[in-house]
Amino acid sequence: KMESLLEEFGLNHIRKNRGDLLSGGERRRTEIARALATDPKFVLLDEPFAGVDPVAVEDIQRIIAHLKNKNIGILITDHNVQETLAITDKTYLMFEGGVLKAGIPEELAADTMVRKVYLGQNFELRKTKLEF
């Protein structure tokens, strides 16, 4: 299983490296591969886009789309709104301990209260949703 995950996530070249020497993107791919080692039906990704460069963000988005295509459920908690909304089917915006709004990204971006308390009035959703 480990061999196939290393191959699938392009991690063969770092298989002997110490964790503290990995880039942010390599670290994220390693974390996701490790989570998949038990063949889960559902994965929680906490801040997957934090601390990684734009190329790594796109790589992680591709991985998430790949997991979705394998029928693995994904729950993402992240403050990087553009990156997250670009790949989600349904979004729940939490505010003060509860769900402020749930819906597709376009619904959240258009909601007056969501803009007031979280997104800001100048927020613009990407024109097209990322497809991988």
Short names for language-model regions:
Residues 84-86:
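A short, surface-exposed alpha-helical micro-motif characterized by mixed small hydrophobic
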Residues 32:
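Hydrophobic anchor residue at the start of the ABC signature
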Residues 39:
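Conserved catalytic motifs of ABC-family nucleotide-binding domains
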